[in-house]
Amino acid sequence: MIDVNNFHYMKIGLASPEKIRSWSFGEVKKPETINYRTLKPEKDGLFCERIFGPTKDWECSCGKYKRVRYKGMVCDRCGVEVTKSKVRRERMGHIELAAPVSHIWYFKGIPSRMGLLLDMSPRALEEVIYFASYVVVDPGPTGLEKKTLLSEAEFRDYYDKYPGQFVAKMGAEGIKDLLEEIDLDEELKLLRDELESATGQRLTRAIKRLEVVESFRNSGNKPSWMILDVLPIIPPEIRPMVQLDGGRFATSDLNDLYRRVINRNNRLKRLLDLGAPGIIVQNEKRMLQEAVDALIDNGRRGRPVTGPGNRPLKSLSHMLKGKQGRFRQNLLGKRVDYSGRSVIAVGPSLKMYQCGLPKEMALELFKPFVMKELVQREIATNIKNAKSKIERMDDEVWDVLEEVIREHPVLLNRAPTLHRLGIQAFEPTLVEGRAIRLHPLVTTAYNADFDGDQMAVHVPLSKEAQAEARMLMLAAQNILNPKDGKPVVTPSQDMVLGNYYLTLERKDAVNTGAIFNNTNEVLKAYANGFVHLHTRIGVHASSFNNPTFTEEQNKKILATSVGKIIFNEIIPDSFAYINEPTQENLERKTPNRYFIDPTTLGEGGLKEYFENEELIEPFNKKFLGNIIAEVFNRFSITDTSMMLDRMKDLGFKFSSKAGITVGVADIVVLPDKQQILDEHEKLVDRITKQFNRGLITEEERYNAVVEIWTDAKDQIQGELMQSLDKTNPIFMMSDSGARGNASNFTQLAGMRGLMAAPSGKIIELPITSSFREGLTVLEYFISTHGARKGLADTALKTADSGYLTRRLVDVAQDVIVREEDCGTDRGLLVSDIKEGTEMIEPFIERIEGRYSKETIRHPETDEVIIRPDELITPEIAKKITDAGIEQMYIRSAFTCNARHGVCEKCYGKNLATGEKVEVGEAVGTIAAQSIGEPGTQLTMRTFHTGGVAGSDITQGLPRIQEIFEARNPKGQAVITEIEGVVEDIKLAKDRQQEIVVKGANETRSYLASGTSRIIVEIGQPVQRGEVLTEGSIEPKNYLSVAGLNATESYLLKEVQKVYRMQGVEIDDKHVEVMVRQMLRKVRIIEAGDTKLLPGSLVDIHNFTDANREAFKHRKRPATAKPVLLGITKASLETESFLSAASFQETTRVLTDAAIKGKRDDLLGLKENVIIGKLIPAGTGMRRYSDVKYEKTAKPVAEVESQTEVTE
C-alpha cells in the first residue's frame, strides 16, 4: 500500500482498456455468487477466490494449504493464492465485453462531453447508442456527410445502391470509430479559427467545444476511452454478501447489477458465436448497454432498474453521492475507536479544566493503557490476564486507572458542533454513576443544558495529540469566542443571580452605617448575624492595601456593602475595588465619592450619610462579562480561569443562600390597566369611524390599529416595571440577566398583546388578559397560532442554518494563514457603518486588532499615532478615534496578495487568543463557523413593513443566504450607472416612476415601480453605482457598475447589518474572508496570445500569471472582468476536485475532472481528510513538520567529568 503521508498530489483520468486489464486479477465469466449448500464462492463467479483471493487468512479454497508458512503459494488444485483475506478488499476483476458500450457519465452528463467532442447533439448520440439509427462513419461514394444519421429504411436504400462501399454503424461501436478518428490538434486549430469569426450561439458552442478538446489534448486521455471494451469489477468485500440468521442472504445492489451485465454479455457472446440474425444481436447489444448504464448510474436514463418492492437499485454513482455516499459518510465523517457517549450532568465542584468521567466508561476507554500498566506493575502476569481483571473490574484496577488518566486529557463534543468551541479538552476525574459531569461555565460554548443532552468523549492517543489537546483545546484556554473576541464563558442563570444578590444594597438592612477596621471584622460580623449581605457599611480604606487607592484616600473610610467586600475578594489584587458597575471603576479606579472623611460626618454618623445616598445598582450579567474581559486583558489565561471558578462558586453559594423562588403573589397586577385599555379602545373606535366614512384606506386603518395596541402594551410594560419592587424575585431574575425579560413579565402580569396569524400577519385583535388573570377561550385559541409557528420556524431555521454553515465551510476551508506578509500595496478604507442615522458598526470596532496601511498623525499635535503595518491595539484605536479621525486605510483580506489563503498582516489578530494570528491557523473554517453559528439566532420571517404595501424587505437568515449566494434580492433597488445629476423624477406608464440622470456625456432614465420609495431629489448629484430607490442592490450588477472594492464593502456592510440588527456581533475579518472567496475568479473576455479560453472562469492568480508570461514575451495579454460567485458555485469551482466532489453534484465534478485529467495538490483541509493525511493547518503544516534539529548539549560523560563530586 502507498503511505498516506508520502504522496503530494492525486490525479484522476479516464482508464484505457489496457489499464483496466492491468488492474484486474482475472476475468469474471459467470454471474454466480456463492454456492447455497457449501456457502463457498463459485469458481469464475463474482466472488471467485481464484480471482479475488482467499476468504480465510492463509488458507486456500480446497484446504490443501493452511497456515502462514505457505504464504504466497498458489494451490495446484484450486488455483487460489495463500495470503491474507484482506486482499479481497483491494483486488479487482474485469469483464471482457462482447460489444463496446458507452460510459453514461460522458454521454449523458450536462453538457454531453461526447456530443461536444463529436459536434453531435445528445439526441442524435442517444439514437445511435441505443440502436435506433445508423451513423455514417465512412461515406465513401454515397455523397453523404460523415456523422449523418440514417434510419433503418434509409440505410437499406443506400446499402442496396452502394453495397460494401460505405460504412455506417449502430451502437457504441459506431461512436467509438468516430472518436478514434478525431485529430485533436486539427480540431483545436479549426476551433481557434472559428472563435475569431463566430458570434452569438455559435461562439458559445465553439468555446464549450474548445474547452473539451483542450482538456483531452492536455490530459493525455484518448477520446475513444469514453467507450468501454472492458468493464472493471470492484473488489468483493466492498460489495459484500452476508448470510442473515434466517438462512437468507443480504447482498449489495451492485452484485445484482453486475449479474445482469454478465448474463447479457454471455448471452451476446453465445448469439455471436451462433451467428444469430442481426436484429436479435442488436437487441442484445442494446440490453447490454442498458445494463452497464444501470451499473454505473442507475436512473440517469429511462426508468431505473428496481429490486424487490420497486426500490431502485444503488449503482456505483449512488455509492458516492449525497450524505450517505462514500465521500460524506465514510471519508469525511468516520466513526472512531476509543470514544463513548453518555448523558451530561452538572459538576459544580469541578475546576475549569476538569470533567467528570463515569468509572466504567473511563475503564473501557483507557483499557489498553490500564492493561499495560497492570502488567508493568506486575499486578497481572500477562496481557490476557490483565484483560480478564479489567472485565471482572477487580479492585486493584481502579487505582491503576486513576494513575493512567491523570494528565491525559480527553475531548468532549456536543452535537451539533456549530463552532470550534463545540469540541474542547478536559482533564478527566473519575465519578460515580453513569453521567458525564460538565463544568457549568462551559455550557454556553457547547450550548448545552442538563435536561437530557448527551455528549461524546474521545481519547487522544498519541503523545502529540495529547500535547495539542492540552495546549490548544483545554477548556481553560478557550475563554474568548473566535467570532468577536468577547469572553464566551460568562456565568449564567444561578451564578449570575448569586452574584447579583451578593452585590445588592438595601435601605432597611440591619446595622446600616456600621464602621469596621478591616475586612476580617466584617466577615466575622456577617457570620454572627450582626450585619446582612445587603448592609451598607464603612471600612477603613487603608486596610484593603489596594495599590489603586491614593494616600489621601487611604486616610478615609470606604463606603460599601458587606456583599461587595466578599465579591471583591475574588478579584485580582491589582484591580481597583469594584464598588459600582461602571467601566470607569473597573478599568481605572474606585470613584472618589465613596471615600468619606470621618471628621466630616454629622451626629448620625455613616448611617445618616447612607440615608441621603441613592442605592448603587447591583452587578448584572453584562458587567460580570466586562470584569472577565478586563481580567483576561491584564492577566494570563490561567489567572482568568481561576477567577472564573471563584466567581462560579460565589454565585452558586449565594444564590442558594438567597433562596429566590417565584410564587403567584410575586406577580403584581397593575391597578390602572383597565383605564389604559379603555383609552386605547376609544382611539381604535375613532380610527374605525374614519375608515367607515372613507377617510382612510383599509391598509392605513389596519396599521393604525396595530400601532395603537403596540403602544398600549408598551405603556403597560413601562408602568409595570416602574411599580415593581427591586427585591421582587422575578424582577431580580430579569434585571440580573439570569432569566426572562420585561416582555415575559408583561405577559404574566400586564397583557399578552398582539399575536401573529399562521401567515405571519399580525391579528389586530389583541389579547388583553395576562396569564395571571387567565385567557378567554378565543384568546387562548389565537395565542396557539403563535406558539405553533414558533416551534415550526425553529425547526426549519436549524436545518437552514446548518446547511448555510456547511456551504460556508466548504468555500473557505482552504483559507489558511500561509505567510507572514504578502507585501500588498493596497488597503481597505474603513469608517463607521451606518444605515441612515442608525449606527450599525462603529469605526473603533472595525480598526481594533487590524494592521494599519498608512501613517496616522494627530491632526492637532502632528504626533505619529501609528505607522504602516503596525497592529492597532485597543489603546491605539481609542487614540485614533479620540483624535477625531473618522476613516483610515487598514490591511484587509480583501486586498491580500497571498496566492492560497491569507497572510498574518492582512488578517490581523486572532480573536480567540487576542494575540497576532500564527501561520497555520485555519482562518477560513473559523470565519465560516463564526458566520454560521449565530445563524440559528437570526429570524426566518420576511417582515411585513407597515404602511408600504408589497415592499417586503428580506431580513434574518434568508437575507444572509441571499447575500452569500449572490442572488437577485427581493425588493431590488435601482442604481445609476453613470455619474451626474438627477434631472427629473416623473410618472411613467403603468404607474411606474421614471428617474432621469444627466451625466457629462449622456442622459439615462431608470424605471422604478410605483410603490418603491425614491431617495434622491431633483438636482442632487449622484456617483456611479449610487442607489436611487430604497431596497437592496443586486450585487452582480453592482460589480460591473461600481467595481470590485465598492462591491466588497457593500457585501460586508449588508452582512453586518443583518447580524447587528439581531444583536449578534461578528468581526469584519470573518465576513472579509468569505467575500474574498466569492470574488476569486475572473471571466476571460479576450484571450490575447495566452493559453486561456475566452468565456472561461479562471482563478485571479492564474490570470495574472498568464499575463505576466505574455508581457515577458512581448505578446498580447488577455483581458477579463471580475465575477461574483455565490458560495455554492464557488465551492464547485474550486481547484480541488476532491473537495468539490465531496460537496455537491459529485458525478458532474468527477466527470469533468476525469476528462481534464485534473490533479489535486491537496492544499485544503477536506482533500487531506479524505485521503487520510494530516491536514495542512496548525502543526500539520509542512513548515512545522520539516524542522531539523541538532543536539547542542555536551554528552553526559563529558559534563560529569567536569563537575566536582560533593557530598
Curated annotation (Swiss-Prot):
Question: Which positions bind Zn(2+) 2?
Answer: C822, C896, C903, C906
Q: What is the free-text note on the cofactor? A: Binds 1 Mg(2+) ion per subunit.
Q: Which UniProt keywords apply?
A: DNA-directed RNA polymerase, Magnesium, Metal-binding, Nucleotidyltransferase, Transcription, Transferase, Zinc
Q: Does the keyword Transferase apply?
A: yes
Q: What CDD domains does the database record attribute to this sequence? A: RNAP_beta'_C, RNAP_beta'_N
Provide the top EC class.
transferase
Which cofactor does this sequence's record say it needs?
Mg(2+); Zn(2+)
Quick one: which residues bind Zn(2+) 1? C60, C62, C75, C78
Q: What is its EC number?
A: 2.7.7.6
Q: Name one GO biological process term.
A: DNA-templated transcription
Q: Which GO terms describe its molecular function?
A: DNA binding; DNA-directed RNA polymerase activity; magnesium ion binding; zinc ion binding
Q: Which reaction does it catalyse?
A: RNA(n) + a ribonucleoside 5'-triphosphate = RNA(n+1) + diphosphate
Q: Does the keyword Nucleotidyltransferase apply?
A: yes
Q: Which SMART domains match?
A: RPOLA_N (SM00663)
Looking at the UniProt record for this protein, which Gene Ontology cellular component terms does it annotate, in alphabetical order? DNA-directed RNA polymerase complex
> InterPro entries, per this entry?
DNA-dir_RpoC_beta_prime (IPR045867), DNA-dir_RpoC_beta_prime_bact (IPR012754), RNA_pol_asu (IPR000722), RNA_pol_N (IPR006592), RNA_pol_Rpb1_1 (IPR007080), RNA_pol_Rpb1_3 (IPR007066), RNA_pol_Rpb1_3_sf (IPR042102), RNA_pol_Rpb1_4 (IPR007083)
Subunit field text: The RNAP catalytic core consists of 2 alpha, 1 beta, 1 beta' and 1 omega subunit. When a sigma factor is associated with the core the holoenzyme is formed, which can initiate transcription.
What is the annotated role of this protein in its UniProt record? DNA-dependent RNA polymerase catalyzes the transcription of DNA into RNA using the four ribonucleoside triphosphates as substrates.
HAMAP family named among the record's database cross-references:
RNApol_bact_RpoC
| UniProt similarity note | Belongs to the RNA polymerase beta' chain family.
Its name, as the record gives it, is DNA-directed RNA polymerase subunit beta'
Which species is the source of this protein? Staphylococcus aureus (strain MRSA252)
Organismal lineage: Bacteria, Bacillati, Bacillota, Bacilli, Bacillales
Give the gene symbol: rpoC
